[in-house]
Regions:
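Active-site-proximal substrate-binding core of FAD-dependent oxidoreductases
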Residues: 54-58, 371, 375-377, 390-433
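N-terminal FAD cofactor-binding segment of flavoenzymes
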Residues: 35-39, 43-46, 54-135, 413, ...
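C-terminal auxiliary extensions adjacent to catalytic cores
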Residues: 423-485
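Glycine-rich Rossmann-fold phosphate-binding loop(s) that bind the pyrophosphate
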Residues: 25-27, 66, 163
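Predominantly flavin-linked oxidoreductase catalytic cores and closely associated redox partners
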Residues: 35-38, 52-57, 161-169, 173-330
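Beta1/beta-strand and adjacent pyrophosphate-binding region of the FAD-binding site
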Residues: 10-28, 62
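Helix-loop-beta segment of a Rossmann-like dinucleotide-binding subdomain
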Residues: 136-167, 172, 305-307
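FAD/FMN-dependent oxidoreductases across multiple families
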Residues: 310-387, 395-405, 409
């Protein structure tokens, strides 16, 4: 037994009982709690909303979020908003800080203006042809705007938002209802198990040393017992990973990406209007997709997605982002702007391939960590929200009941249909950039009936490939310093 485990076992912990305990406050949990509150407002006398732990009182619902503030996230997002608008049919984007309707959407293929990216011979030939035909095709600022894009990529009629500000807006509405308590700065360390049932969660200990042992100012994390634990803590959340370790992961749950972004205040004379949406590919590496979204008040989200299939990384994601914003197409709009904040986020790229066990006795998983992201359309916020709305109150929260309610609704939804169509949309990228684009086009245009299928390397295979590429890129005398963990 480890010292850390032994120490944890002798700590005297307080216990609190609630009806519903939620882990993580993102779009999925926001969707779940909003649906719950709306149903309670419509019929507060419904016996389903009476607390089992405090008879005569409404449901005791607590949500724990590890971030210091509900608006902590800096991610900009563009979403069709189908599920969000279904929840808020009279939604006015002006009510949400930094939100605006999509007004203009463009897709650009970016040429390499400095010649530093790793491009195949075939792609270099294509670039040369574009440059030669530039005056005819309208190539400008080392970028070619696609004259046509398939419908599955369009977000027209959707919303440009800040996830942090959207979460804050939703959270404020929930807190004002009186039914829900949301506690930021309260990380959850582990789920509580009784056999194969989840009986609640344990809050993280405060005031511990690097080994997790009590130090000055120690405060033991409370055990929160709940009839249902709703896990919406994102793609690599602490509780989601613990459930994976307990119940197992999907066979092809292997792909992750890193999103890196800046929030920039554009100069006063900017030509970019609020609601402008740009999607890009081709630079700083062909496999890296980029974006630029313009919010109200001249605020702009700009960033890149560094995918898991990049087996030969030569720069950090942050360095890639710095190169990206200096591309001529973007730099002319950004160079006199002011950096307001920056951040990064992990992305679950496995999509349907990475779907874990969605529910069991006493628990349900919603959101990105439940495999809801559509990797064909590159969308996940609206899908996460809808998975939350599909988890409606149904007691007792047994595995059978959850499968007959939550999972049944989810399987019959447009989220499931989209995820299934996208299941192999990006598999082709493991064979190269051009096969990847062909695979995406096939999947998108045929509704997933056709796609470039194949072997998806395991995480260890991808790590070894990246390690070998790193060794090959450094001098022989330094190669010994690069260790494979």
């Amino acid at each position: 037994m480890s010292t850390e485990t032994a120490t944890a076992e002798i700590i005297d912990r307080q216990t609190m009982e609630v009806d519903l305990a939620c882990v993580g406050f993102g779009p999925a949990t926001g969707g779940f709690l909003t649906t719950l509150v709306n149903a309670w407002n419509e019929n507060p006398a419904d016996p389903a909303f009476e607390s089992r732990v405090a008879p005569g009182m409404p449901l005791q619902v607590l949500c724990y979020e590890r971030a210091d503030d509900l608006a902590a996230g800096v991610s900009g997002v563009v979403t069709k908003g189908k599920g969000i608008r279904a929840t808020f049919p009279e939604l006015n984007p002006a009510e949400i800080p930094m939100a605006v309707d999509v007004k203009k959407e463009q897709i650009f293929y970016l040429l390499d203006p400095i010649g530093a990216s790793k491009r195949s011979g075939l792609l270099r030939m294509g670039d040369a042809a574009l440059k030669m035909l530039g005056p005819v095709l309208g190539v400008k600022d080392a970028a070619y705007e696609l004259p046509w894009a398939p419908g599955f990529l369009h977000k027209n009629g959707g919303l440009v938002m800040s996830i942090g500000q959207f979460n804050q807006w939703v959270g404020s509405n929930l807190m004002s209802s009186g039914l829900v308590q949301i506690w930021p700065s309260m990380p959850v360390s582990e789920p509580l198990f009784e056999g194969t049932s989840v009986t609640g969660i344990r809050l993280a200990d405060q005031g511990v040393d690097k080994q997790g042992n009590p130090s000055d100012g120690f405060m033991a994390g409370m055990d929160v017992k709940a009839a249902l634990t709703v896990v919406g803590d994102g793609p690599v959340g602490q509780i989601g990973r613990a459930l994976d370790q307990k119940f197992g992961t999907a066979a092809k749950h292997r792909e992750w990406a890193l999103g890196m972004k800046f929030l920039i205040e554009l100069p006063e004379d900017t030509e970019l209007e609020a609601g402008t949406v740009w999607h890009t590919f081709g630079f700083p590496e062909p496999e890296i997709f980029g974006f630029l979204y313009v919010h109200p008040d001249r605020l702009c989200s700009v960033g890149v997605f560094v995918p898991s299939w990049m087996g030969e990384p030569s720069r950090t994601a942050y360095r890639y982002l710095q190169h990206y914003i200096q591309h001529p197409l973007l730099w002319k709009h950004l160079q006199n702007g002011t950096l307001r904040s920056w951040g990064a986020k992990s992305l679950e790229e496995s999509g349907k391939h990475g779907e874990p066990i969605l529910s069991g006795n006493g628990f349900a998983r919603i959101g990105e960590g439940s495999g809801s992201t559509n990797m064909l359309t590159g969308s996940g916020v609206d899908e996460a929200w809808v998975t939350g709305t599909q988890l409606r109150a149904g007691q007792p929260f047994t595995e059978e009941n959850l499968k007959n309610s939550y999972e049944k609704r989810r399987r019959a939804s447009w989220v499931e249909k989209g995820a299934s169509e996208a299941i192999d949309a990006r598999t082709g990228f493991h064979k190269g950039f051009i096969p990847g684009l062909i695979g995406m086009a096939l999947a998108g245009l045929t509704g997933g009936k056709l796609a470039l299928k194949g072997h998806i390397p395991t995480a260890s295979e991808q790590i070894k490939k990246a390690h070998a590429a790193t060794i090959a890129s450094v001098s022989p005398e330094k190669a010994g310093d690069v260790a494979l963990a």
